[in-house]
């Protein structure tokens, strides 16, 4: 992953493996061992962390706080394998509950349609609590068949533009070839005329400051 990031000219790469709530993914021992990994490989600075799972309507996540000091970056999202969608109100409160968690830096793929939510209070909460929303490229890939993802992400971008809330673009690369792949996002950025200054991907120091690094 670091080699691919270097080849593409990236200065900073975040790697966040799924937390244990998803069957077959990393155990807590994996996260305990992250301290052995160099934080600069092939000239690329690494942020190593976890993609935590929101598991209930309160926004509870599936990894204990004792692990948080071991994680450079902590993102949280709703995943169908460990979250039972409720009403729009319940799902919205679940996501906002995670946004309110001071240990969470980013909400992953909030617009992928796994659970129907109300985006305006989510965007406002992200602004209030200094939590980034991810615009996820993989969710927009037609092969994923996320039928509401395009409209959802357009809504998020329009609201973030309206309220001047920064976002992070995520490739959601599960293989090195997809690192820094944002092809499905670019069309949405153009359609919404989204301000470049609200995209933190190419602002390394601003991003690191945002997440407290």
Name these PLM-found stretches.
Residues 1-56, 62, 66, 106, ...:
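An N-terminally biased module of ancient metal coordination in phosphate/nucleic-acid-related enzymes
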Residues 155-156, 163-165, 185, 207-212:
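Accessory recognition modules or surfaces
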Residues 61-62, 69-166, 173, 179-180:
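Domain-core and long-helix interface of multi-subunit machines
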Residues 177-180, 185-187:
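Active-site-adjacent betaalpha module
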Residues 188-193:
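Aromatic-rich peripheral "rim/lid" segments of glycoside hydrolase catalytic domains that contact
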């Amino acid at each position: 992953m670091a080699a691919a990031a270097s080849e593409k000219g990236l200065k900073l790469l975040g790697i966040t493996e799924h937390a244990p709530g998803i069957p077959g993914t990393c155990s807590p021992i994996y996260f305990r061992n992250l301290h052995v990994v160099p934080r600069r490989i092939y000239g690329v600075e690494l942020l190593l962390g976890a993609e935590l799972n929101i598991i209930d309507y309160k926004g509870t996540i599936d990894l204990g706080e004792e692990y948080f000091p071991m994680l450079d970056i902590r993102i949280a999202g709703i995943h169908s394998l460990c979250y039972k969608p409720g009403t729009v109100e319940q799902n919205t409160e679940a996501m906002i509950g995670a946004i309110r968690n001071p240990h969470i830096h980013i909400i992953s793929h909030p617009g992928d349609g796994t659970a129907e939510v109300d985006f305006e209070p989510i965007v406002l909460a992200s602004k209030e609590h200094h939590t980034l929303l991810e615009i996820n490229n993989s969710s927009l890939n037609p092969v994923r068949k996320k039928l509401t993802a395009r409209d959802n992400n357009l809504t998020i971008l329009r609201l973030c533009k309206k309220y001047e809330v920064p976002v992070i673009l995520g490739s959601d690369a599960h293989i090195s070839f997809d690192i820094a792949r944002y092809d499905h996002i670019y069309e949405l950025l153009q359609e919404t005329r989204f301000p470049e200054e609200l995209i933190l991907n190419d602002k390394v120091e601003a991003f690191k400051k945002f997440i407290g690094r």
